[in-house]
Amino acid sequence: MLRSYDLHRDEIPPGTLYLLILKTLARSRELHGYEIANSIQRISDGVLEVEEGSLYPALQRMLIKGWVTAKWGTTAGNRHARYYQLTTAGRKQLGVEMSQFERVIGAITRVIEAV
């Protein structure tokens, strides 16, 4: 059954969450999880919404892979939060993710535009 809220929600395309997180962190020195999700949503004009249930497990996997580091800090609102920062390995992975994404988008475009 399709719920009414499903009609207004755009999901992150499969295989792009790492790319979106890495690119968001590449633009900033460090961000906490809420800032990452908020930045993606803001830059996409509200089209892309990263759910907490997807974001934090992805960040944990990225920590394990060595793509990001994390440290505890205090937000502007005086809340305790974990701040994430891109590593050298993360910058390299961002290049890999971008190349794969561009290859897939190019292939999709060719199929759509084929006569």
Language-model regions: role of each:
Residues 1-16, 97:
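Intrinsically disordered, low-complexity serine/threonine- and proline-rich regulatory segments
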Residues 11-54:
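N-terminal helix-turn-helix DNA-binding core of bacterial DNA-binding proteins
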Residues 55-62:
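Basic amphipathic alpha-helical segments that dock to polyanions
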Residues 63-79, 85:
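Beta-hairpin "wing" of winged helix-turn-helix
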Residues 89-115:
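Amphipathic alpha-helical dimerization/coiled-coil segments
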